[in-house]
C-alpha cells in the first residue's frame, strides 16, 4: 500500500496506527512525501524504528501534486498488488487480511485487481454497495448507477503497463482515473463487497476544492476530458466531457481547442454550455479569493 502526503503530519498518525493494528502484516507501506515542510520525515523515521511487523519505505520528492505522487509510487512498488490509502484515511483492522485472502482465492491474470468499499467513520458505506456479481469495470460500475468513491486495488504489473500521468508545468493536478479508464478497456476488477478503507474528507483535500482545481489546472483537466471523449460509453458523458473541455480550454486560452478535440462536432455543440461553466468557475474562484 502507498500513501502520497503533503504537510499531513498532523493526521498521518491515524493511518499509521491503523496499520499497526492490522491482523495481517503481509504488506509494505510506501510513503511518498510530496515536498512536505512539516515534521513528516521525522515522524516516519520514528515509525521505522518501532519495527511494528511490517516494512515502511519513505521517498521524498519535490512538490508536484497527487498524480506525481502516484507516478513516483508506481516506479517504486515491487509487490504484486498495490492500493493507495490517502494521508487523511485509514484502514479497518482486518483490511489487509481481507484483500490478501480474497486475492488468493479469486485472483488471476484475467483481472486488473479488486474494487472494494470505502466507508465513513460511522461505518456508513460511501455512495452505494457494489453489485452482486463477480467483476466489473470501474467505469461500468458508475455507468450503471453506481455512486461514491470506491477503493481500488490494482495489480502492479497492469497499472504500470499504461502511460504515466502527464505532468504539466505550473500545474498540480491530473485526474487519477486516467490509468483506471485505460485499464477498463482491457480488464475487469473483482468485486469485494467489504470495507477496506475509512475515509475522511479534509478541508484542505483536493476533493473539497474542485472549482479551484479546475481553475489552477486547466491542462490536466482538459487532457482527461479528451480521454473521456474517446473512451466513455455513454453519449451524455461524452457531451459533459466536451463541456468541461471547452471550459478548461477557455481558462488556459487555448485557441486550438476545437482542432485538438477528438469529438469536434460534439465540442462545437457543447461550446455555449462550456462558456457558462467557464464563467461559473471564474466567479467561484473570485469568491474564494475574496
Q: Which residues fall in each region the model found?
A:
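Glycine-rich, basic loop-to-helix element that forms the pyrophosphate-binding segment
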Residues: 61-77
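Conserved nucleotide-sugar donor-binding catalytic segment
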Residues: 120, 124-208
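Catalytic core of nucleotide-sugar-dependent glycosyltransferases
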Residues: 209-235
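Short, well-formed alpha-helical segments that are part of the catalytic scaffolds
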Residues: 7-21
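A conserved acidic beta->alpha catalytic loop
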Residues: 18, 33-43
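Conserved donor NDP-sugar-binding/catalytic core segment of glycosyltransferases
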Residues: 94-128
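Short aromatic/hydrophobic "clamp" motif used to bind/position activated sugar donors
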Residues: 82
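Short beta-strand/loop segment that forms part of the nucleotide-sugar
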Residues: 26-35, 57-62, 86-87
Amino acid at each position: 500500500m502507498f500513501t502520497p502526503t503533503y504537510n499531513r503530519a498532523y493526521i498521518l498518525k491515524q493511518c499509521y496506527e491503523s496499520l499497526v493494528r492490522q491482523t495481517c502484516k503481509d504488506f509494505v507501506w510506501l510513503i511518498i512525501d510530496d515536498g512536505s515542510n512539516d515534521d513528516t520525515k521525522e515522524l516516519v523515521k520514528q515509525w521505522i524504528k518501532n519495527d511494528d511487523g511490517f516494512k515502511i519505505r519513505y521517498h521524498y520528492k519535490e512538490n508536484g501534486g497527487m498524480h506525481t505522487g502516484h507516478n513516483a509510487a508506481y516506479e517504486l512498488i515491487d509487490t504484486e498488488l498495490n492500493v493507495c490509502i490517502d494521508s487523511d484515511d485509514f484502514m479497518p483492522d482486518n483490511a489487509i487480511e481481507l484483500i490478501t485472502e480474497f486475492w488468493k482465492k479469486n485472483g488471476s491474470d484475467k483481472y486488473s485487481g479488486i474494487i472494494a468499499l470505502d466507508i465513513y467513520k460511522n461505518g456508513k458505506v460511501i455512495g452505494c454497495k457494489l453489485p452482486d456479481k463477480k467483476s466489473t469495470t470501474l467505469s461500468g460500475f458508475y455507468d450503471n448507477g453506481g455512486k461514491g468513491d470506491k477503493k481500488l486495488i490494482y495489480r502492479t504489473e497492469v497499472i504500470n503497463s499504461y502511460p504515466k500521468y502527464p505532468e504539466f508545468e505550473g500545474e498540480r493536478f491530473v485526474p487519477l482515473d486516467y490509468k483506471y479508464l485505460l485499464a477498463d478497456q482491457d480488464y475487469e476488477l473483482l468485486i469485494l463487497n467489504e470495507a477496506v478503507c475509512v475515509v475522511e474528507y479534509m478541508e484542505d483535500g483536493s476533493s473539497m476544492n474542485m472549482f479551484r482545481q479546475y481553475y489552477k489546472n486547466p491542462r490536466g483537466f482538459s487532457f482527461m476530458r479528451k480521454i473521456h471523449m474517446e473512451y466513455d460509453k455513454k453519449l451524455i458523458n461524452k457531451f459533459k466531457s466536451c463541456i468541461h473541455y471547452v471550459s478548461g480550454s477557455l481558462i488556459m486560452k487555448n485557441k486550438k481547442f476545437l482542432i485538438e478535440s477528438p469529438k469536434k462536432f460534439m465540442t462545437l455543440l457543447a461550446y455555449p454550455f462550456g462558456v457558462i461553466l467557464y464563467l461559473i468557475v471564474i466567479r467561484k474562484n473570485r469568491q474564494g479569493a475574496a
